[in-house]
Amino acid sequence: MFLGWERLVPHDTQLLALRYPGREARLTHAPFRRMSDLVEQILSATLFLEDMDLYLFGHSMGALVGYAVCQEMKARGRRAPSGLVVSSSRPPRGTPESAPIRTRSDASLCEELLALGGTPPEVLKDPATRELVLSSLRADYELLETWTPLEGPIDSPIHEIHGDADTLTEDDVDGWRRSTTSDFHSRTVPGGHFYLSDSPALATHCLTDLIRSRRTTNHQ
């Protein structure tokens, strides 16, 4: 999903991508089932960036992971990221609003994936591949549905971005607005939940704008 992004961000920006177990080349690796375990891994992996300006970008579940990382950094007294871009995601909530999605049938989860887009239908037709994909998806939902966000907003600016054909609402956008004590910006772009697969520049422009605005602020 993020291949080629290094050509779309400022030349003096180092782009690092996290590949979760249970994804792509790590599809056969056991996925995380608890947010705390995933956040701990990310915090360890980013220790060498402690003295640098760190910007986090998260799409869908990744947006909530990024937010959880910011919360934990704040709780531990680590330097706050210079910004967080949340893409195609509802804001963090303390308790699930409905029955756990991870307990749904395979057919129901396949319908969910196809409705969101981003997953070729032929992938779900192969039984072995479908089992791997759904196992990873159930783990993702378990991670989200068992996660209780820490109390209080983060101190990093948040830029929210979503497609105009996605199912996010104004209440969702307001939820993200309330999730930071710093600046907040929201942007609606053409497309659905996976708008960035077809038009990655829409997402990288948002990230670039955040980086440039923070650099301007820091030099004033």
Where are the regions a protein language model picked out?
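Non-catalytic, mobile gating and regulatory segments of ester bond hydrolases
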Residues: 1-220
